[in-house]
Amino acid sequence: IVEEGLAASALERGGAAGEPKVALRRMGDPVLATAAGFAHGALESDTAVTFAGGTQLLAVVALLRHAGVEATLPVATTSFLAADPSANVEALAADLDAALTVTDPGFAGSSHSAMAGYARGEAKEGVAMGGVLALAERAGLSMAQVRQAIETVYGRLIDSESER
């Protein structure tokens, strides 16, 4: 995929090194620039920002670092992403001097089919779960309480689907 993107963008490997705007313009997801802009504005107004995600949000952190943002940039992710060697979020966060929080929702031991499936890798991240879990912890909620709430909402969704 990377090679196809480089060919389509007329970039060579490393051709935009040190030039994140060029890399983003040629190969990046436009939402990354939007997220970086929102975050930059929030940080300038002294609004707390937490990036909930993995590699994509670390790309936003990289854009902010290249833009000269020196503030603490917290990134919250799940143990699923932290354990993924292809994502390498811990090393990326360290390279970008981002404050990484990793939370484990404890789905692996769950008897609930959706959570057990998630723990087996049947679902993909992309729902800001790491940020939600980090905020839940800060609010004093246990992961058991979070799992119970997920089961309750999941049950309501399944029940409403079966009524259709």
Locate the predicted segments by residue:
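N-terminal loops that bind phosphate or other acidic moieties
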Residues: 1-164
